[in-house]
Amino acid sequence: MAGSALEALLVGIGAIPGAWLRLKAVNHFEPMVPKKHWGTFAVNVIACFGLGLVLALYQSCSAKTGLALLIGVGFFGSLSTFSTFAVELLNELRAGRPFVSLVLALASIAAGLCAAGVGYGLGAYG
């Protein structure tokens, strides 16, 4: 199997459980706090942590390229959902709640950066 076909297969295999987990997480939070965006927020922060960890392990050469594609790009890439995040921000703006949109955007970016940093730190130094 050619390298690019194998890489695509690894990403696809990793994406299946990541997308499934995202669906489960978002559906889990929705009945408890409707329209509060906690499901999207949670999966994006978890994905940032995981991708930071995988990146650090990959850069230290303790993770192989195939494993990084499977877990980093496939699983954590499909777990995170920037498009849903953007639509949720847009919906808050359209509903006349710019402050909610701003707080959600800033909190998501700050939490995502912190989570990626912690994941990277654990992978690089832990």
Curated annotation (Swiss-Prot):
GO MF assignments: fluoride channel activity; metal ion binding
Activity regulation annotation text: Na(+) is not transported, but it plays an essential structural role and its presence is essential for fluoride channel function.
InterPro entries per the UniProt record, alphabetical: FluC (IPR003691)
Keywords, comma-separated and alphabetical: Cell inner membrane, Cell membrane, Ion channel, Ion transport, Membrane, Metal-binding, Sodium, Transmembrane, Transmembrane helix, Transport
Topology in the lipid bilayer: Multi-pass membrane protein
Origin superkingdom: Bacteria
Record localization: Cell inner membrane
Binding site for Na(+): 77, 80
Location, primary (coarse class): membrane
Listed GO CC annotations: plasma membrane
Record Pfam families: CRCB
Catalytic activity: fluoride(in) = fluoride(out)
GO biological process, one term: cellular detoxification of fluoride
Regions crossing the membrane: 1-21, 38-58, 67-87, 99-119
Reported function: Fluoride-specific ion channel. Important for reducing fluoride concentration in the cell, thus reducing its toxicity.
Family, similarity comment: Belongs to the fluoride channel Fluc/FEX (TC 1.A.43) family.
Record protein name field: Fluoride-specific ion channel FluC 1
Organism of provenance: Synechococcus sp. (strain CC9902)
Lineage, broadest ranks: Bacteria, Bacillati, Cyanobacteriota, Cyanophyceae, Synechococcales
